[in-house]
Amino acid sequence: VEAWETLAGRSVEWKGVHHSMHGDFRDISTHTVTYESRDRCYVTADGKLVADGVGYTYQKLDHRMAILIYRPEVYQGRSGVVLYSMLDFARATDRAVILADGEPFAVADGTIREVPTPARPGPNDGFGRRRGG
């Protein structure tokens, strides 16, 4: 699979593990990110909306690799979080370094695949309009 020109209009399932001083974030070990536009996405897990209105930047580098940077308002209860992801489309992997307030917080190591866009949970499902990641 070649790196995509854009993520807009796609939904991507992520399965993997997070490594942090607090252990894995099991509530999001499998989640789907739906890219509504070229700079906004939302995240669902277990049929619940876990992040909404998340800003992101995507840059395809070549036929295989892309950089993806997420800026959620809240992530695992923390603000000031930025996720720096390296997407390898040939291996279908996503590896990220996650900073909180500019300091190392966690890493994420997972696989990715495009999936049909899941039904968007309503504002009263899951965490509602709470933003996170």
PLM feature segments, named:
Residues 1-2, 67-132:
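Beta-sheet ligand-binding and adhesion/scaffold domains
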Residues 11-15, 30-34, 106, 111:
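Ser/Thr- (and often Asn-) enriched beta-sheet segments in non-cytosolic proteins
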Residues 7-13, 38-42, 63-69:
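Short, hydrophobic/aromatic-rich segments at coil-to-beta transitions
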Residues 15-27, 44-50, 71-77:
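Short, solvent-exposed secondary-structure boundary motifs
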Residues 56-64, 71-73:
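Short, conserved turn/kink motifs that form compact alpha/beta structural patches or helix kinks used as
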